[in-house]
Curated annotation (Swiss-Prot):
GO biological process terms held by the UniProt record: amino acid biosynthetic process; aromatic amino acid family biosynthetic process; chorismate biosynthetic process
Signal peptide: none
GO MF annotation: an example: FMN binding
Pathway: Metabolic intermediate biosynthesis; chorismate biosynthesis; chorismate from D-erythrose 4-phosphate and phosphoenolpyruvate: step 7/7
InterPro entries referenced in this protein's UniProt entry, alphabetically: Chorismate_synth, Chorismate_synth_AroC_sf, Chorismate_synthase_CS
Organism annotation: Streptococcus pyogenes serotype M3 (strain ATCC BAA-595 / MGAS315)
Chain sites annotated for binding NADP(+): 39, 45
Name used for this protein in its record: Chorismate synthase
Highest classification ranks of the organism: Bacteria, Bacillati, Bacillota, Bacilli, Lactobacillales
EC numbers for this chain: 4.2.3.5
Cited function: This reaction introduces a second double bond into the aromatic ring system.
């Protein structure tokens, strides 16, 4: 399985082409639209999300509600493009129109300046448009297809916010996977403690009035993955490493950890390692899951626990100082439309990116020309692991 995305933030559309999806997977536009709508939600989103109503168009690889094994083409129309026809025109236009909405005051924390340097842009909008988080629309669309595969194999997932703008979420003890999932899904903030909703919303409103932004830490949990996915044989075969790369590829993500993560630096080995158990009914298990479901780059059969830290959005309504790329004089950075926070949306993106990596690993590990073939191979492997 592989995919490419294309499109600009204010261009006519966004596109993804996915190759390697088995034939016979039940797939409808509504499956993808559901994830796209989740990405657009969450408290703190800005005006752009009120303009766009993301709906996918499937133009290849699916017939009568089933995948055919051919490449799948997904497209999402940018409604806002109608206001940017001159600025984002494909053909050559008058010089005066080219200067319309030109970006020459790069924003600290964005790809504007370095992208302009790398690709020799006189107008930093050429970097801004592609590096925008709008691209993650298609990462979510691809992830929605991946989640359909995982669902057919009995794998489920959730995400929730652990730290929201410096506020630590108090996680009620002994919540089951399903309880965590339901609480997060029904929260505008993707948190599992409803008692903290008001405090955080008030804080977001305050940050918005100040023209500032906030980030946080997101946790994604995956249930139902058997032991043995990934490999220790080569460095690039380690599944946790693949997940780390994928999570860090999401806009504004600056760190990733598994299980108790960086807290391991303060603990002894006897406190960190997950003791092994075995029962006739369940096979191998663990007393704990401090390592987040990974050993030696391979899954252990425990839930996968992946955490990502998202920096505050770098576009500020009270912009920081920058430099004019023409005169090199100090100047306030360009202001583009932005949100005080996009943490709930980022959680949806992270969840779908993780799903994509896991689906790809499974498709590369098991015979998967068709879904029935994949389901049998995966079921046989689960049975083997249980009796090992």
């Amino acid at each position: 399985m592989r995919y490419l995305t294309a499109g600009e933030s204010h261009g006519p559309s966004l596109t993804a082409i996915i190759e390697g999806i088995p034939a016979g997977l039940t797939l409808h536009p509504a499956d993808i639209d559901h994830e796209l709508q989740r990405r657009q939600g969450g408290y703190g989103r800005g005006a752009r999300m009120s303009i766009e109503t993301d709906r996918v168009q499937i133009s290849s690889g699916v017939r009568h509600g089933k995948t055919t094994g051919a490449p799948i083409t997904l497209t999402v129309i940018n409604k806002d493009h109608q206001k940017w026809l001159d600025v984002m025109a494909v053909g050559d236009i008058e010089e005066t129109l080219k200067l319309k909405r030109r970006v020459k005051h790069p924003r600290p924390g964005h790809a504007d300046l370095v992208g302009g340097i790398k690709y020799h842009f006189n107008d930093l909008r050429d970097a801004l448009e592609r590096s925008s988080a709008r691209e993650t629309t298609m990462r979510v669309a691809v992830g929605a297809v991946a989640k359909r595969i995982l669902a057919e194999l009995g794998i489920d997932m959730l995400h929730h916010i652990l730290i929201f703008g410096g506020i630590t979420i108090t996680i009620p003890s002994k919540l089951s996977f399903r309880e965590l999932q339901e609480r997060a899904l029904h929260s505008e903030l993707s948190i599992v403690n409803p008692k903290q909703e008001k405090e955080i919303k008030t804080y977001i409103d305050k940050i918005k009035k100040e023209g500032d932004t906030i980030g946080g830490i997101i946790e994604t949990i995956v249930q139902g993955v058997p032991a043995g996915l990934g490999s220790y044989v080569q460095w690039d075969k380690k599944l946790d490493a693949k997940l780390a790369q994928a999570v860090l590829s999401i806009n504004a993500f600056k760190g990733v950890e598994f299980g108790v993560g960086f807290d391991m630096g303060f603990q002894k080995g006897s406190q960190v390692m997950d003791e092994i158990t075995w029962t006739p009914t369940q096979g191998y298990g663990r007393q704990t899951n401090h390592l987040g479901g990974f050993e030696g780059g391979m899954t252990t059969g425990q839930p996968l626990v992946v955490k990502g830290v998202m920096k505050p959005i770098p576009t500020l309504y009270k912009p920081l100082m920058s430099v004019d790329i023409d005169s090199h004089e100090p100047y306030k950075a360009t202001v583009e439309r932005s949100d005080p926070t996009a943490l709930p949306a980022a959680g949806v993106i992270m969840e779908n990116v993780v799903a994509t990596v896991l689906a790809k690993e499974i498709l590369e590990t098991f015979s998967s020309t068709t879904m029935s073939e994949l389901q049998k191979a995966f079921s046989d492997y689960r049975a083997y692991v249980k009796q090992f």
